[in-house]
């Protein structure tokens, strides 16, 4: 099966995890909330090359936890450890000690292609995009409401756009 590039982003909350995949070829968008089996099915069905911004240093660890069938609460621990570890990946890898090896799809991380390093918001501004933020705090300690999910989905889709080449 031919591989397509899918731009991907994830958002992690205490009780919710969202993945958005946007196919480069035709813009098809697939979103998956809190469903490890659907993520596995997506990977099996589409054999994607995943492209993102800071994917190797963040989203790949979140994806590994998802593929290990971890619940959103445990995925949030991975998220918080990544943020608190300040690039010390040995701390993050420690969360996966004793876990089976998980094969990730091929990954293109555009963060490492930009020198000097720039934040995604800075790139958005430099290419004339509007800056979109979510109004939902990432430290909310309850399941998201339907309205909050719509807001987070809008934000997550927008995060895929700066890396989506015309």
How would you describe each model-predicted region?
Residues 14-19:
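Short N-terminal binding/cap micro-motifs at the start of the first secondary-structure element
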Residues 3-12, 108-109:
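Two-metal-ion RNase H-like nuclease active-site motif
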Residues 22:
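Short, acidic/hydrophobic/Gly-rich beta-strand patch recurrent on exposed beta strands
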Residues 111-166:
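Acidic, Mg2+-coordinating catalytic module of metal-dependent nucleases/exonucleases
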Residues 9, 52, 159, 163:
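Short, conserved catalytic/metal-binding motifs centered on acidic residues
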Residues 25-122:
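Conserved DEDDh/DEDDy metal-dependent 3′-5′ exonuclease domain
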């Amino acid at each position: 099966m031919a591989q397509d590039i899918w731009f991907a982003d994830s958002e992690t909350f205490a009780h919710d995890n969202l993945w958005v995949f946007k196919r480069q070829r035709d813009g098809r968008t697939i979103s998956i909330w809190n469903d490890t089996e659907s993520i596995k099915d997506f990977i099996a069905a589409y054999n994607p090359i995943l492209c993102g911004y800071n994917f190797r240093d963040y989203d790949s660890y979140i994806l590994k936890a998802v593929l290990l069938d971890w619940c959103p609460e445990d995925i949030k621990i991975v998220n918080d450890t990544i943020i608190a570890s300040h690039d010390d990946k040995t701390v993050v890898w420690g969360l996966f000690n004793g876990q089976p090896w998980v094969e990730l799809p091929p990954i293109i991380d555009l963060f490492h292609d930009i020198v000097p390093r720039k934040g995604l918001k800075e790139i958005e501004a430099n290419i004339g995009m509007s800056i979109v933020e979510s109004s939902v705090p990432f430290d909310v300690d309850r399941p998201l409401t339907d309205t909050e999910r719509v807001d987070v989905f809008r934000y997550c889709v927008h995060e895929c756009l700066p890396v989506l080449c015309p």
